[in-house]
Amino acid sequence: MEERQTCDLAGIWRFEIDKEDRGFAEHWEKRRLTQTITLPGCLQAQGYGDAISEDTPWVQSLYDALWYQRGEYAYAQENGTKVPFLSQPPRHYTGKAWYQKTIFVPEKSDGFVGRLTLENTKWKTTLWIDGECKGLSLIHISEP
């Protein structure tokens, strides 16, 4: 029976938000990203993205467009916008982001098959290894 090894990738990753969608054209897969983020975790909870305001798209679509003027939300005026949801994200961002992690595979890895599992990504994921595209996944399971 073949021995199965796992590598926990939780921890600090290099990271950058690609708000202007320049990453592919500028080959960000070949450069060292400049910011850091802890995974697992979401970027909004770690201070990335835009501040929540009345202009945030999903806030604008609330049924009661003037909800922030109602008395029960007066507490929010001092500390910034609060929305009438049980769980409010501290920041808002739904665009592209790049994540980068260095791992080492032992040289004695003939027949190595790697499997990368990512949770809670949106839309699609592209996997790069050593600057080379290894796959695009819409179901978020990729085996290079």
Regions found by a protein language model. Name each.
Residues 1:
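Short, Gly/Pro- and small/polar-rich lid/capping loops
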Residues 5-23, 41-142:
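Accessory beta-strand-rich segments of carbohydrate-active enzymes
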